[in-house]
C-alpha cells in the first residue's frame, strides 16, 4: 500500500506542476500552487463520483469524517498558509461560509504541507470559522487524484448532499464564482 501511495504521489507531482493554469513552487514546502487563471467544472448528477471516505484530525485536534456531513452540501477547500493564491481566496471563503450556514452548506478546509502554528495563524488572520483538516503529507489530497491535481493548490470541491463530487474550482475561488457553483450544483426545487 505504501508503494502505491508513493507511486500516486510521484505521478501527481510529475503531472501537475504546470498546465493551463500555470503553477509556482513554494520553496519551503516543495508544494506547488496554481497561478494565473482558474477553471470551474460542474459535474452532471449522473456522472458524479462518490467522494472518498475522508477522515482526519482538524487543526483544533478534533476528529472529522466527511461522511458525517451527508445531507449537507460541503465545500472542501485545499489550502496552505504559504500559498499566495490561498491567501487571496481565504476572505471570500470565510464570508461565504458565514452567509450560507443557514442553507446547510458546510465548509471544510484541508491544510496542506504546513506547520500547525502557521496554519492556525492563517485561520486567525482570515477569520476562518470552519474546521480544517491537517494534511501535512498530502494524503487527503491524494484521495481525490483524477478529479483534481493534488500537488497544486488551491483547489475547491463541492460535495453534494448525497456525498458525490458535484463541482470543482482549480485555482482561486472567488466569492461570486463559488456562490454560483454552489447554486448550480444544488437540486432545483420548483
Each predicted region: which residue ranges?
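A short beta-strand-turn-helix
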Residues: 45-48, 53-74
Amino acid at each position: 500500500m505504501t508503494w502505491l501511495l508513493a507511486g500516486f504521489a510521484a505521478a501527481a507531482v510529475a503531472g501537475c506542476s504546470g498546465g493551463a493554469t500555470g503553477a509556482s513552487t513554494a520553496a519551503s514546502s516543495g508544494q506547488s500552487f496554481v497561478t494565473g487563471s482558474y477553471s470551474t467544472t460542474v459535474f452532471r448528477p449522473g456522472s458524479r463520483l462518490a467522494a472518498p471516505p475522508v477522515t482526519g484530525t482538524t487543526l483544533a485536534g478534533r476528529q472529522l469524517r466527511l461522511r458525517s456531513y451527508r445531507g449537507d452540501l460541503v465545500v472542501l477547500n485545499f489550502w496552505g498558509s504559504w500559498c499566495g493564491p490561498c491567501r487571496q481566496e481565504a476572505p471570500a471563503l470565510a464570508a461565504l461560509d458565514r452567509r450560507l450556514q443557514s442553507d446547510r452548506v458546510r465548509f471544510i478546509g484541508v491544510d496542506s504541507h504546513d506547520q500547525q502554528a502557521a496554519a492556525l495563524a492563517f485561520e486567525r488572520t482570515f477569520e476562518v470559522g470552519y474546521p480544517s483538516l491537517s494534511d501535512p503529507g498530502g494524503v487527503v489530497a491524494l484521495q481525490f487524484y483524477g478529479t483534481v491535481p493534488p500537488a497544486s493548490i488551491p483547489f475547491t470541491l463541492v460535495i453534494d448532499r448525497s456525498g458525490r463530487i458535484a463541482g470543482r474550482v482549480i485555482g482561486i475561488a472567488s466569492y461570486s464564482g463559488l456562490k454560483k457553483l454552489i447554486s448550480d450544483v444544488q437540486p432545483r426545487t420548483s
